[in-house]
Regions:
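A contiguous, low-structure linker/loop signature
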Residues: 1-24
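Active-site loop segments of alpha/beta catalytic cores
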Residues: 5, 27-189
Length: 189
């Protein structure tokens, strides 16, 4: 129920216009409030036994997840990123606002210890470190910064899903309590 952001799931995601249609939700939208309520219940059950973390995808990853996991279209995210970078940046900013709201509520209203924050390079040669930082990184960092203000226990996960390699240097300024990456995919242990 929570894996898809509503304005991403209800969107054809075919062009820049579709990316511009992605808008933030009201703070009392069920996509936010129901996650908080669910995590309140879960952390009540387990937080006295183990540390509790919640998987949070970085802003534009919600778009990639929709396209790859739901549509099974493994090329369209890169197509959109290459052909509509400013529109993707807009979508990331809008999604980032909701993710910040969600993270703030989760880390202040539940017994979560931190978030497990998932990032991944845009798998395109057009997205060098400078472009990534400008189009994607600013909004990723805003979420992580907020999480770090609320908890010292956040985990940065550099996702190697489907054996997509990442330039780990892109994340050298991403401060977290712990780091996780795909050891075999990245070839770094």
């Amino acid at each position: 129920a929570f894996i898809g952001h509503p304005t991403v799931m209800e969107n054809p995601l075919r062009n820049g216009e579709d990316l511009l249609a992605i808008k933030r939700l009201p703070e009392d939208h069920p996509w936010i409030t129901e996650q908080v309520e669910h995590l309140k219940k879960m952390t009540e059950l387990f937080s006295d036994k183990v540390m509790c973390f919640y998987n949070i995808f970085s802003p534009v990853q919600w778009i990639r997840i929709r396209l790859e996991f739901f549509d099974l279209d493994f090329e369209r995210f890169v197509y959109l990123a290459e052909n509509y970078p400013k529109e993707l940046q807009h979508a990331g900013k809008e999604l980032g606002k909701d993710i910040q709201t969600l993270v703030r509520k989760l880390l202040t209203e539940t017994k979560l210890d931190g978030i497990y924050y998932c990032v991944q390079n845009v798998q395109s040669p057009k997205y060098d470190q400078k472009t990534y930082k400008e189009i994607v990184g600013e909004d990723e960092l805003a979420v992580l910064k907020l999480a770090n203000e609320l908890s010292p226990y956040n985990i940065l996960h550099i996702c190697g899903y489907a054996h997509h390699k990442n330039n780990l240097d892109f994340y050298k300024d991403y401060e977290a309590g712990a780091y996780n990456w795909a050891v075999h995919t990245e070839g770094v242990s």
